[in-house]
Amino acid sequence: ESGWNRIFSFNLEPGYVLLNKLTSVIFNDFRFFMIIVAAITVFPMMSVYRKNTRNAGIEIVIFINMSTFIMMFSGLRQAIAISLGLVALSYAQERKLVKFILIILFAMTFHLSAFMLFFIYPIYHHKLRKQSLWIIVPAIVLIFIFNRQIFTLLTMLLPSAYSDATLSFSNAFTMIILLVIFVAYSFIIPDEGSLDETGKGLRNLLLFSLVLQLFAPVHNTAMRMNYYYLVFIPLLLPRVMESRKDRWANLTELSKFVILLFFTVYFFYYAYTSTGSLHVFPYHFFWENV
């Protein structure tokens, strides 16, 4: 335990250190700190999801299969920042720019990578036309082909904590394939006249998430940056389904069933067989002796 004069001498973001110190002064029990972190993480996320939900079942099964869900069990600092990122999305939807900026600056006091949230506002409100896909799709292909070279250049612009990272290959191709499927689904299925502004904004964020994911095979830093955007995807797909074109009605109903079944089965299979996912599985309660 450290005195107040030393709390900002740690090589950690000040918001997290201050929260840790305040909790230790009041409770002096690490379990209470975990409870508070869980509350700060879950309740803002729950509020934004509840506000934007269209199909809770589909949203839940997609969310728990996103890598962000697993990370939240161990990456406490970034879990708080991601939750605040959902609040930032809410402010972006309401065009409250000052509050949007302030909540992101606050999130950065818990994890510096939260600077990625600043992209939400312009991307969400961009009026993207389907004709633009003739440029976007080839650009995405080129980014994937030259992802290593592009990432090397981008790291020069990042804070030193990220720019000092050495390049390494990771197994992130499965998520790329999944995001490509989601992007195709979100552009093919809906009637553009029926898809509301929230749906179009979330679809823009999905495209940006795909672009970020293209760099994940090069280095896990890109995956860390994308955690902030993966949590928006579960909110998008039910809106796409609601706005489906008449000719895709049967396919949409089938996709609901497939998504619910596949992601439910996959989650339990992954939880049962996985051994290296940030030591989350198999899950043990704190009172268990393992």
Give residue ranges: language-model regions.
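Short hydrophobic/aromatic helix or loop-helix immediately within or flanking a transmembrane segment
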Residues: G3-N28
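Transmembrane alpha-helices of multi-pass, membrane-embedded glycan-processing enzymes
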Residues: N20-T23, F33-P44, A81-L84, I233
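Transmembrane-helix signature of polytopic, membrane-embedded enzymes
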Residues: M46-M66
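Short acidic/glycine- and proline-prone juxtamembrane loop motifs at membrane-interface regions
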Residues: F73-A79
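Membrane-interface transmembrane helices that cradle and orient dolichyl/undecaprenyl
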Residues: G85-V98
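Transmembrane-embedded, aromatic-rich helix segments that form part
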Residues: F100-I103, S113-Y124
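Alpha-helical transmembrane segments and terminal signal-anchor/GPI-anchor hydrophobic tails
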Residues: Y121-V231, T273-N289
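Signature aromatic-anchored transmembrane alpha helix within multi-pass, membrane-resident enzymes
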Residues: V137-P138, R247-F267
